[in-house]
Amino acid sequence: CHGFRNDSKVKLRGEGPAVMQLQSGNTYRFRPDGSAIEPVTWGQVNPFGMCFDRWGDAYTADCHSKPITHLVRGGYYESFGKPHDGLGFAPPMTAHDHDSTGIAGVAVYDAAQYPAEYRDCFYVGNVITNVVHRDVPQWRGSSPWISAPVDFVSCPDPWFHPVDIQLGPDGALYL
């Protein structure tokens, strides 16, 4: 993920002067040895956190647009003043903004340690409201849809700001 107003140039490893221009909001994939980089999606504003579900589908948490985005390879997503490719923007997976623009981190829970109702849900950190939201997807064909988030963890302590969420190898969610 590449954040808002962070246009960068990346030199690829190997022979020759191969340089790739990274544009803000887009997502990219790299070869482990640094010899190749390619765009996966275009748009978004400030993706801040990424996860993959059990089927290998990618999701991002994005500040200032949709809290969770299902990344469809080659898709264009709404951003500040950026056009789509002529076919329109990829479909959103929620109309709810989670009550802020400070979304940071997303994890999908696909382990077996939590009760069934908490599995296959998305967990999103909200650093403005001091909440970790649990987003329960309803599937519309192969596309997930989130009606509204449910508070999973909330804290009145002003120092509690969930900036990242990860699923650990032990099946626990780490904030």
Task: Locate each region found by the language model.
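Beta-propeller domains with acidic blade repeats across secreted/periplasmic ectodomains
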Residues: 1-175
